[in-house]
């Protein structure tokens, strides 16, 4: 990861490279920029807000894990708090392509898992595909969300997705990233399972009711959470395992560092993530133990 950052720094404008390097090369950099950090970079570089976000995209793309396509995409979202969150596309050898995570989904779930309750804008290397436009239409801030592309005027999501189909068409009022706590608890004393329940309580699954969460523990002892992000169009839904894997990659860890995993889901759900979670983890490392609980 450090070498990717160094390559991006070498290609960036000197004013940005000089002031960004101490931030992005720090051991505790977590693929996000605070409002204060971003505002300082604006002053130091003399760039406009849009120009700076576009200039930061190569640093987001540095997190890309694309062994199949070798097509590296970065995305940056700004939460309602003003903080910026990086994201990048993620692919998996040995499993079907439906497990792929797009850069927009990565950045959005990154902000979500760090507590944001909505987004004001998203900046992307390339025009968002239909899959991602639909995924973004599930957000609490979809109507106001702005999209910035390199060398293009900023537009609203619904300029890219006119006459959209969304939650309201299915009679659903809840939205992805809205503040929620589903109230699940377990008497299981396993610490990793407890964290998976924590993720489950933040999940969004109004269509199948399969509220679910995943917790991954790595050799470092750190734990990464993933909550299920369901979508009105079904296919763009993002499974809890993928959301957790995104957090792991954006923290600078590697899949081979995963030591154990836990999945918890509602017994009232019309679907289950168990088989896909097991098969994807097995493709990464067949020795990863997976604990499972249905509540």
Swiss-Prot record:
The lineage of its organism: Bacteria, Pseudomonadati, Pseudomonadota, Gammaproteobacteria, Vibrionales. This is Cytidine deaminase. Residues 48-168, 187-295 form the CMP/dCMP-type deaminase domain. It catalyses: cytidine + H2O + H(+) = uridine + NH4(+); 2'-deoxycytidine + H2O + H(+) = 2'-deoxyuridine + NH4(+). Homodimer. Substrate binds at residues 89-91. This enzyme scavenges exogenous and endogenous cytidine and 2'-deoxycytidine for UMP synthesis. It is an enzyme of class 3 (hydrolase). Binds 1 zinc ion. InterPro entries: APOBEC/CMP_deaminase_Zn-bd, CMP_dCMP_dom, Cyd/dCyd_deaminase_Zn-bd, Cyt/Deoxycyt_deaminase, Cyt_deam_dimer, Cytidine_deaminase-like, Cytidine_deaminase_bacteria. Gene3D superfamilies: Cytidine Deaminase, domain 2 (3.40.140.10). Belongs to the cytidine and deoxycytidylate deaminase family. The active site is at residue 104. Zn(2+) binds at residues 102, 129, 132. Pfam families: dCMP_cyt_deam_1 (PF00383), dCMP_cyt_deam_2 (PF08211). GO terms for molecular function: cytidine deaminase activity; identical protein binding; zinc ion binding. One of its GO terms (cellular component) is cytosol. Its EC number is 3.5.4.5. Keywords: Hydrolase, Metal-binding, Zinc. The gene is cdd. Signal peptide: none annotated.
